[in-house]
Amino acid sequence: MSGEENPASKPTPVQDVQGDGRWMSLHHRFVADSKDKEPEVVFIGDSLVQLMHQCEIWRELFSPLHALNFGIGGDGTQHVLWRLENGELEHIRPKIVVVWVGTNNHGHTAEQVTGGIKAIVQLVNERQPQARVVVLGLLPRGQHPNPLREKNRQVNELVRAALAGHPRAHFLDADPGFVHSDGTISHHDMYDYLHLSRLGYTPVCRALHSLLLRLLAQDQGQGAPLLEPAP
């Protein structure tokens, strides 16, 4: 499937339906912020990335890595692609780029969302060949079982398979088990059954931080060869 056929892999700016220009203002701020920073890690994605920055665990785990947070609420894969093609990677040379996006790709199939994520990985590989890419798996959503939850699960399976054996990209299923045995998700973990609470962010961020440290150590020749996380 080519980018022309797949709307999820066609770089597209957000339509400013509210008329206040906030999305473009954030994009310009990210480009400006990158000009005088030397991050080891860059996070890019939707509100799950954006809101992480407000949690204490960000300051505990990721600030020491001089991490930049380029998350914008509501973004889909096509919006992240546009941002990356328009300056957000130009002035930095991170060692790792963390990508967490796809749950907002409403109206796109699991295959299309996967194509969008693969396009992001390819673009980062082209623009930042020294960097590894870590793709975080999409989380379950909704208090009760629903089609979007199933679609996110399918995306994760497809992305995991697509990145298997990739020399510079890694898939991490960061879900610690948010779905309970009765099929429900607790508001203690996801306060609106989509966005993570501080409690919900903790296991996700600790699993990610562990992987980031392993990757950074491996690139510095201090670690054993990385084994991909088991399905």
Curated annotation (Swiss-Prot):
<comment type="similarity">
    <text>Belongs to the 'GDSL' lipolytic enzyme family. Platelet-activating factor acetylhydrolase IB beta/gamma subunits subfamily.</text>
</comment>
<dbReference type="GO" id="GO:0003847">
    <property type="term" value="F:1-alkyl-2-acetylglycerophosphocholine esterase activity"/>
</dbReference>
<keyword id="KW-0378">Hydrolase</keyword>
<dbReference type="GO" id="GO:0006629">
    <property type="term" value="P:lipid metabolic process"/>
</dbReference>
<feature type="active site">
    <location>
        <position position="192"/>
    </location>
</feature>
<dbReference type="GO" id="GO:0005737">
    <property type="term" value="C:cytoplasm"/>
</dbReference>
<dbReference type="InterPro" id="IPR013830">
    <property type="entry name" value="SGNH_hydro"/>
</dbReference>
<keyword id="KW-0443">Lipid metabolism</keyword>
<dbReference type="GO" id="GO:0042803">
    <property type="term" value="F:protein homodimerization activity"/>
</dbReference>
<dbReference type="GO" id="GO:0008247">
    <property type="term" value="C:1-alkyl-2-acetylglycerophosphocholine esterase complex"/>
</dbReference>
<feature type="active site">
    <location>
        <position position="47"/>
    </location>
</feature>
<dbReference type="GO" id="GO:0016020">
    <property type="term" value="C:membrane"/>
</dbReference>
<dbReference type="GO" id="GO:0016042">
    <property type="term" value="P:lipid catabolic process"/>
</dbReference>
<dbReference type="GO" id="GO:0007399">
    <property type="term" value="P:nervous system development"/>
</dbReference>
<protein>
    <recommendedName>
        <fullName>Platelet-activating factor acetylhydrolase IB subunit alpha1</fullName>
        <ecNumber>3.1.1.47</ecNumber>
    </recommendedName>
</protein>
<dbReference type="InterPro" id="IPR036514">
    <property type="entry name" value="SGNH_hydro_sf"/>
</dbReference>
<keyword id="KW-0442">Lipid degradation</keyword>
<comment type="function">
    <text>Alpha1 catalytic subunit of the cytosolic type I platelet-activating factor (PAF) acetylhydrolase (PAF-AH (I)) heterotetrameric enzyme that catalyzes the hydrolyze of the acetyl group at the sn-2 position of PAF and its analogs and modulates the action of PAF. The activity and substrate specificity of PAF-AH (I) are affected by its subunit composition.</text>
</comment>
<dbReference type="GO" id="GO:0047179">
    <property type="term" value="F:platelet-activating factor acetyltransferase activity"/>
</dbReference>
<dbReference type="GO" id="GO:0005829">
    <property type="term" value="C:cytosol"/>
</dbReference>
<keyword id="KW-0597">Phosphoprotein</keyword>
<feature type="modified residue" description="N-acetylserine">
    <location>
        <position position="2"/>
    </location>
</feature>
<dbReference type="GO" id="GO:0046982">
    <property type="term" value="F:protein heterodimerization activity"/>
</dbReference>
<dbReference type="Pfam" id="PF13472">
    <property type="entry name" value="Lipase_GDSL_2"/>
</dbReference>
<dbReference type="GO" id="GO:0044877">
    <property type="term" value="F:protein-containing complex binding"/>
</dbReference>
<feature type="modified residue" description="Phosphoserine">
    <location>
        <position position="2"/>
    </location>
</feature>
<feature type="active site">
    <location>
        <position position="195"/>
    </location>
</feature>
<dbReference type="GO" id="GO:0042802">
    <property type="term" value="F:identical protein binding"/>
</dbReference>
<keyword id="KW-0963">Cytoplasm</keyword>
<comment type="subunit">
    <text>Forms a catalytic dimer which is either homodimer (alpha1/alpha1 homodimer) or heterodimer with PAFAH1B2 (alpha1/alpha2 heterodimer). Component of the cytosolic (PAF-AH (I)) heterotetrameric enzyme, which is composed of PAFAH1B1 (beta), PAFAH1B2 (alpha2) and PAFAH1B3 (alpha1) subunits. The catalytic activity of the enzyme resides in the alpha1 (PAFAH1B3) and alpha2 (PAFAH1B2) subunits, whereas the beta subunit (PAFAH1B1) has regulatory activity. Trimer formation is not essential for the catalytic activity. Interacts with VLDLR; this interaction may modulate the Reelin pathway.</text>
</comment>
<keyword id="KW-0007">Acetylation</keyword>
<dbReference type="GO" id="GO:0007283">
    <property type="term" value="P:spermatogenesis"/>
</dbReference>
